[in-house]
């Protein structure tokens, strides 16, 4: 049997996402190219690895076995790469960082400073929501993650590096703008523009109100922070966002923060990686950079 690593890599991505389309997006391939790699793997093995249930693809019994071994092979290859990178030293190497979409408001500046100090290290930055970040940690397919609350269902190391205050935003002409000490009960009468399911900000927002016995009214749902802010500016509802995402809007008075009981909700950003993972010199250098530069970086962002 002649199975290629490329075939296994493509198969593993399809199996993780239960989708050829999402696998193609992750791997930066066309969907026909992904389908061809899976088909060639099935031909080599002599068994079907997926079956269709409606619009979703699911693993067959043979597919589940191949998925188990493909992940083990992938893990061994990543460990080999890390060992080889360690032999090169911190002046060289590659680094894959994944960040929550809200972190992306300061991540490029963070990466630029790090790149100036370590120009020989190649950086790849993935920006996605919390659900996808947890999947990346679970599959150990990323070196380091910058995110909000670390997952509980994956064994990870998590180190706080910056405050992440969540605030309630409204357009400047909203009736609650300028009011003091707004109660949560009063706020619950308003409609809220929501991030999508799987968003860390949405989960934090819903948890905050639930823990205080309040239910919020869901309005429009958006997959991007910029869309959420635009919807709030247009009067479609209030929202809860990270203070880091509205620096420009506050300066220009396009949005205002409301003085609400319990807000700002003081949270933190974390640097997260799989427990027991041997960090490459490049990953170790980035970790030390983030933790040591956090206070200075916070001042820049402020």
From Swiss-Prot:
Chain ranges of the HTH lysR-type domain: 1-60
DNA-binding region in chain numbering: 20-39
Keywords, ordered alphabetically: Activator, DNA-binding, Transcription, Transcription regulation
Pfam families: HTH_1, LysR_substrate
Keyword DNA repair attached: no
PROSITE patterns per UniProt: HTH_LYSR (PS50931)
InterPro entries membership: LysR_subst-bd, Tscrpt_reg_HTH_LysR, WH-like_DNA-bd_sf, WH_DNA-bd_sf
Function: Trans-acting transcriptional regulator of RuBisCO genes (rbcAB) expression.
Name the record gives this protein: RuBisCO operon transcriptional regulator
Organism expressing this protein natively: Allochromatium vinosum (Chromatium vinosum)
């Amino acid at each position: 049997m002649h199975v290629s690593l490329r075939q296994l890599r493509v198969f593993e991505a399809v199996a993780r996402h239960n989708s050829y389309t999402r696998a193609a997006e992750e791997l930066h391939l066309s969907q026909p190219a992904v389908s061809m790699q899976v088909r060639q793997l099935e031909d080599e093995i002599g068994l079907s690895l997926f079956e269709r249930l409606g619009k979703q693809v699911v693993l067959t019994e043979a597919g589940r076995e191949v998925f188990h071994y493909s992940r083990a092979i992938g893990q061994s290859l990543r460990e080999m790469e890390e060992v080889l990178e360690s032999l090169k030293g911190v002046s060289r190497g590659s680094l894959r960082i994944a960040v929550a979409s809200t972190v992306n408001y300061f991540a490029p500046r963070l990466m630029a400073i790090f790149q100036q100090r370590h120009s020989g290290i190649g950086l790849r930055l993935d920006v996605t929501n919390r659900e996808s970040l947890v999947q990346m940690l679970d599959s150990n397919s990323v070196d380091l993650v910058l995110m909000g609350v670390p997952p509980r269902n994956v064994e990870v190391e998590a180190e706080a590096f910056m405050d992440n205050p969540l605030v309630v935003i409204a357009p400047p002409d909203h009736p609650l703008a300028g009011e003091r000490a707004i109660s949560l009960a009063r706020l619950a009468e308003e409609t809220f523009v929501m991030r999508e399911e799987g968003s860390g900000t949405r989960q934090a927002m819903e948890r905050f109100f639930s823990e205080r016995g309040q239910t919020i009214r869901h309005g429009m749902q958006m997959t991007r922070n910029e869309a959420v802010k635009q919807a709030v500016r247009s009067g479609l509802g209030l929202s809860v966002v990270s203070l880091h995402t509205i620096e420009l809007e506050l300066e220009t008075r396009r949005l205002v923060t409301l003085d609400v009981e319990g807000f700002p909700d003081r949270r933190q950003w974390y640097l997260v990686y799989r427990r027991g993972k041997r960090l490459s010199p490049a990953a170790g250098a980035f970790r030390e950079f983030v933790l040591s530069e956090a206070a200075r970086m916070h001042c820049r962002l402020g």
